[in-house]
A protein has these predicted regions:
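Domain-level signature for soluble enzymes in the chorismate/prephenate branch of the shikimate pathway
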Residues: 1-282
Length: 282
């Protein structure tokens, strides 16, 4: 059976994403992100499902430091709607709760709701671990923020669904593989391309490196800087663009990037997820 690795405990949102994209695969829980990526690098799993950013809490900082250190490829993206649930032990009421435990990202996404209810926030390793710990300790004054899948797995009650501060909360995942998956350009499809590059720390270096995307009409949808090598110079970048390298405009833009930048590495080109085809991305 094929295997997909994810960070977290069974019932985590990464696990939920795995059940959506790879329902018939074995889902391998890992303690951390590098563990999930290493399973793929070493051939113990075919894929890794890794969260990159959330529409409410922003980017997952650690991932940008890890991606350049692997030799893995991005073969797909997945957008998972986040329905945070406030969980409690069976028979517990909201009035009994004093503290709520969850992953820091989940706490940030439900921050205002908990302030309004006067609940103290406590960080946990991940959302599902907070649910599992709640089930094991049996404290009726403690709640957890996790998925409905976690509630089902650990026998907890759902006191509130959609507990997040902002509706439409969504997490973007990237699917990593040890082998590149070259998908020839199909004019009937829309594509994303993800890549890494570096520039010298001099005036206009980034401007020149990215100029080709503007002159060739290629839309850049994400540009993130990250530190590397123990320096404080943010001259390393992760870039997502609309398009496929087999398209002339994209090919020309990448050629200009390679001229002005260094260490250009295309992580992968993959079909655009249907979430991007909604009105918000048109």
């Amino acid at each position: 059976m094929s295997r997909v690795a994810y960070q977290g405990t069974a019932g985590a949102y990464s696990h939920l994403a795995c059940t959506k994209v790879f329902p018939d695969w074995e889902h391998l829980a890992c303690d951390d992100f590098i563990g999930a990526l290493d399973l793929v690098s070493k051939g113990f799993a075919e894929r890794a499902m890794i969260p990159l950013e959330n529409s409410t809490a922003g980017r997952v900082e650690e991932i940008y430091r890890l991606i350049p250190r692997t030799q893995l490829f991005v073969i797909a993206e997945h957008f998972e709607p986040v329905n945070h649930c406030l969980l409690a032990l069976p028979g517990s009421s909201l009035d009994q709760l004093k503290r709520v435990r969850s992953h820091p990202q989940a706490l940030a996404q439900c921050h205002q709701r908990m302030i309004n209810l006067g609940l103290k926030q406590e960080a946990a390793v991940d959302t599902a671990m907070s649910a599992k710990g709640l089930a094991e300790k049996g404290d009726h004054t403690v709640g957890a923020i996790a998925s409905s899948l976690a509630a089902e797995l650990y026998g907890l009650d759902v006191l509130h669904e959609n507990f997040q501060d902002v509706m439409g909360n969504t997490t973007r995942f990237l699917v990593f593989s040890r082998e590149a998956e070259h998908q020839p350009y199909d004019a009937e499809k829309r594509y994303m391309t993800s890549l890494l590059f570096s520039v010298r720390n001099i005036p206009a270096a980034l401007y020149k490196a990215l100029g080709g995307f503007a002159t060739n009409g290629v839309n850049m949808v994400k540009l993130e800087s990250y530190m590397d090598g123990g320096t404080m110079e943010a001259s390393h970048f992760h870039l997502d663009i609309y398009g496929h390298p087999d398209q002339p405009a994209v090919a020309n833009a990448l050629e200009e990037l390679r001229y002005f930048a260094r260490d250009v590495r295309v992580l992968g080109s993959y079909p655009m997820h249907s979430y991007r085809k909604s009105a918000a991305f048109v």
